[in-house]
Amino acid sequence: MTTPKLDRRQVLKLEAAAMAALAGGIAMPAAAANLVTERAVSELKWDKAACRFCGTGCSVMVATKENRVVATHGDTKSEVNRGLNCVKGYFLSKIMYGHDRLTQPMLRKTDGKYDKNGEFMPVSWDEAFDIMAEKFKAALKKRGPSGVGMFGSGQWTVWEGYAASKLFKAGFRSNNIDPNARHCMASAVAGFMRTFGIDEPMGCYDDIEAADVFVLWGSNMAEMHPLLWTRVTDRRLSAPHVKVAVLSTFEHRSFDLADLGLVFKPQTDLAILNAIANHIIKTGRVNKDFVAKHTTFKRGQTDIGYGLRPEHPLQKAATGAAKANDATDMSFEDYAAFVADYTIEKASQISGVPAAKIEALAELYADPNTKVTSFWTMGFNQHTRGVWANNLAYNLHLLTGKISEPGNSPFSLTGQPSACGTAREVGTFSHRLPADMVVTNKKHRDIAEKIWKLPEGTIPDKPGYHAVLQSRMLKDGLLNAYWVQVNNNLQAGANANEETYPGFRNPDNFIVVSDAYPSVTALAADLILPTAMWVEKEGAYGNAERRTQFWHQLVSAPGQARSDLWQLMEFAKRFKIEEVWTEELLAKKPEVRGKTMYDVLYRNGQVDKYPSSDIEAGYLNDESKAFGYYVQKGLFEEYASFGRGHGHDLAPFDDYHRERGLRWPVVNGQETRWRFREGSDPYVQQGAGVQFYGFPDGRARIFALPYEPAAEAPDAEFPFWLSTGRVLEHWHSGTMTRRVPELYKAFPEAVCFMHPDDAAELKLRRGDEIKVESRRGFIRTRVETRGRNKPPRGLVFVPWFDEAQLINKVTLDATDPISLQTDYKKCAVRIERVTAS
């Protein structure tokens, strides 16, 4: 195909459009895009990549020159973002070039030897791995597999997470590996599994253009998923009948578009959800045919506790904690009687939301002529009843049959770029294996051991330490060798003073942190490993709509920085298999004696079957250069074998480098947009119409679950609710975005958003320095009574991106007892003026 020739006037016009687009982030005309990427005189090489930030999964075009990323812009060929980027995406080219980028391993030393209390000194990779292997072997000798652990990430690439999970579950025989997605998506996973028997959304982003109503539950899409919000906004403003409802514990930017805004008391969303279900039933709008054919009813266990330490009074008092995930059968009539108690008036009394607003919201769901898409994220998931909240949202769509078709979709949004693709699909959680398999299921372990060529009994049959429990075990000295990758848990983990930091500095423990920058977590470690970022390695992410996206390595990492994948595989060479497997296992597979973990796990005839010559010409691949084969392709194809044939099908590896992502299941080259719906999902049997095939009976579960209060609420001593979260300009702990000058200047430090009347009552003015204090710790910050976030009286909001203000010292480490996900949205604090000393 030839590119049409342009005359000089057209060239100048398009060049101006292209440069304006690159500077301002607007979409480029196709011809202008061609000019930038194909113009013969251009010195820039452009390639596609998935954005490094949130779970939306935008595609960007990346320009490189002289082994450096010099520009990015939105990918006009992407179905997700259609050429646009958010403000963070515009500055992707700068995230790798902070002045304090780590370029060599650093070990704490005194007088030339490792010392837990020593200063960081540069060391070689050999010395770093020597001391690391020594400490891991000592922990294994002392405690067995339970003595070692890893905290991974929803920012791992697919093959990094897969290699890490394999290293621990098959190599070290320890399930003590968990991703930071435990803090963001675990409740969504458990909600999917309980309701549908299979994980991840049934809908896709195409629902946005087909919906009549959007309902946001605990989701500030305007700032956290801004490119999706542009599509919602376009739909709302271009179709007069479309409505937007937003529910939150405080007003934020998403309320600007809302036709119906509901601010409720923390935790009371549970009562509102049940009241809507009751309204649907009482007004005769249940889709009886759909419910009869496709659902069954369950009564969930109640009084399940709050995931605190066993000795905590709330845990001791919880009668249902031991069976938190249990449920019993019930009839529709029993369910209707259960929710009948949740009248709109009662929900109003519990939540503080006017009854008329709750009824208006209920009508949006109940109206059989409206298509409803519900979006939610951390407001639901970071919740001590987060799994219940997910289940109750699905109830509304199942009762009305508004599910698995264009515009009718309950949609859990993800916060990290591969929380779906890596944490969930790969199964890097402490209880999971790839493709929704779990370590507690013998059949699933058998499948994994067969694919991984392991002797029977290699994978432990009990879940390992989840994220919060890892911190507790480190503190208690029961987890002694710990590796953190793509993570900043000292800034992110709740109750950091009491439960996270003590474990890092416990003299019995050895802590390794792989990072690109000296984060709070890295600086508390014993060994820091410098790590490659984003397009400094070949990668793959899976976004919130089941879309898997690949990119090539485009530039080299600085200095001695290496990818997480290289680190995992290279470290495996330090262990003979006899050092990690029992004699019983070795007797079942004697041919592995004398081999290293690397040989057994990564040179097994599958991972190493693709030659480096398969790499597309013109691209770097440092891992394949180091190991002598196409590492990423081998790992991906082995991983993909877990899901092919039972609803998790991934396309062949090479397809993804050609496409802007594909939504699984991908069968016969065709992606799936709407799961469980005949005609869209190849796994639905002919004539079924809808089939929730995650369960053998093909039915989804509708749960009866009550409102239960939060673990901690305001009182006379601590009279305010505290909620935490993100802001548009920064991502998570700010490790990347705070090193981008433009983003740093846009929002340089965290503040405490509070109601002006609360501030006046405390004799505070905007900008005053205050102390935000809970029973666990405090921070100093400044009052903000204006701006984007508008809390109601009695609630304050503090974002967590600022490492100089560790708000996680204040938060409570309560979790959902089913998902084990932390609740960062509610605890009790007091506000005091900081007086000059």
Curated annotation (Swiss-Prot):
UniProt: Mo-bis(molybdopterin guanine dinucleotide) binding residues: 88, 155, 180, 184, 217-224, 248-252, 267-269, 378, 382, 488, 514-515, 537, 564, 724-733, 808, 825
Signal peptide start and end residues: 1-33
SMART domains, per the entry: Molybdop_Fe4S4
EC number annotated for this UniProt entry: 1.9.6.1
PROSITE patterns listed in its UniProt record: 4FE4S_MOW_BIS_MGD, MOLYBDOPTERIN_PROK_1, TAT
UniProt GO molecular function: 4 iron, 4 sulfur cluster binding; electron transfer activity; iron ion binding; molybdenum ion binding; molybdopterin cofactor binding; nitrate reductase (cytochrome) activity
Major location category of this protein: periplasm
Localization per record: Periplasm
Catalytic reaction list: 2 Fe(II)-[cytochrome] + nitrate + 2 H(+) = 2 Fe(III)-[cytochrome] + nitrite + H2O
Protein's GO biological process: cellular respiration; Mo-molybdopterin cofactor biosynthetic process; nitrate assimilation
Required cofactor names: [4Fe-4S] cluster; Mo-bis(molybdopterin guanine dinucleotide)
Pfam families assigned to the protein according to its UniProt record, in alphabetical order: Molybdop_Fe4S4, Molybdopterin, Molydop_binding
Subunit structure: Component of the periplasmic nitrate reductase NapAB complex composed of NapA and NapB.
Protein name: Periplasmic nitrate reductase
